[in-house]
Amino acid sequence: PTETQLKQELKQAESSKNAPNQAETTEALQSALNWLAERKESQTRSEQYQKVIDDFPKMTQELRRQLVLESNKILPNGDDLPAAELEQQILQTSSLLLEQARLLQQEQDHTREISDSLGQLPQQQTDARRALTEVQRRLQAQPANPTTPYAQAALALLQTEAAARKAKVDELELA
């Protein structure tokens, strides 16, 4: 079911105050909407991961080009510069080095976070696959054509949960 369909069904369920299982129906539909949102987030992250993967060769080529340009820069030797100008260059270089050291520390922290998360990735993948298998099993146990609003909402909930869990498995496979 789509987000629009679920929102319409939720409005109908909320307005049907005397319907049997009204609270459970609205809760199931709201949960289904939450699963759709989670699925959308996983798909967005998957797209971002894929973009990074696709852009990696171009990015590394650009970084290599910048490295060559930096290493080919000719620095003044300072023989013909006044002391005040040399001191100014030293201050600028020192400031630049401090900034680069700060950026390097940030990169090292980020690399450490990535390394830590990579260590957890196999377990996360296993857990996500297990959860997907479980929801698919529950989905297959549901009647194909539910007749009550609550049964329809429960089916929609399982369908959206299965879609969200599948998107999470796909996301973790790209990570």
What are these regions (language model features)?
Residues 1-175:
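Flexible, low-complexity extramembrane segments of multi-pass membrane transporters/channels
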